[in-house]
Amino acid sequence: NICSDIVAVLKQVKITPEDRTLSVLPLHHTYESMAGFLSILYSGASIAYMTSLTHLLADFREYQPTIFIAVPLLLKTVHSGIIKKVKAVPGGSAYLVVGKAITTLSGAFSYQVASKVFANVHAAFGGKLKTILCGAAALDPAIFKDFQKLGFHVLCGYGLTETSPICVMHSDHVIKPGTVGLPICGSKAKILDPNEE
């Protein structure tokens, strides 16, 4: 199960030997173990481990990760700090409107443009961060969209320890805020007793 999950995850998101991640979640957490450790090692990428939460930004600047694996609570905390700083800059709210317009551009080009517009935000994350993988709980769609506006490629997924653990996930090409993606290769999903949502 674990090996097939690694292969399936790497079909959803491109991770190369040139990539680096900064690990902040405990390795006994199955999501971190799969997404932040086994998949990274299998792809030949590098892992740095944070020194402490109080030194997280310093660790980002030192290790310059290209991929960040997080849970929604951590992204919510980081998000509130970023948005507060962006809005504090003269014209900061206008930058967010520009960021929203940029996300309507096609694919990777929109992320490249947004990363230039929000260069200071990207510098705080070491200047190399491209992709944020989020799992273990639902990510607020507004936070998802704000990270996209800032020029980050956000992918969400869902799973259980019993599914080793990832069973559905966004792919690099199919991303919809407020969702967790489609079943990964080798997985099937079925909604039982659907409600209005």
Language-model features: where?
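Conserved AMP-binding/adenylation subdomain of ANL enzymes
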Residues: 3-20, 27-120, 128
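Conserved AMP-binding/adenylate-forming
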Residues: 68, 109, 113-197
